[in-house]
């Protein structure tokens, strides 16, 4: 499967948090998040390993007991089962990759962005 990013097809999942799944395979899935300043992803955990890359903006991340700010160009890895949260300090755009692929995020695919 191949995909192309566009400005359409994002869906709201929480106030100030929009998501679109860009591409997926058998073992991984990549989503793009648009994050509005002042919004937050509450503390949660899941069985997926999650790696992220911040394209723009600033976040305050908590991964387990580790707390730090993320700026454009920063990346992170969240082990499966570890509690984490994010506070959006400035409007931000992030890419997140999940392994194994999150079946619950397949609904965030935009059919118009799929190239084959």
Residue positions per predicted region:
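A short, N-terminal "cap"/entry segment at the start of jelly-roll beta-barrel domains
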Residues: 1-27, 110-116
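Conserved short histidine dyad/triad with adjacent acidic residue
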Residues: 31-45
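Ligand-binding loop in jelly-roll beta-barrel domains
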Residues: 80-104
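Short acidic-glycine-tyrosine-enriched beta hairpin
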Residues: 65-80
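Structural motif
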Residues: 58-60, 67, 83, 93
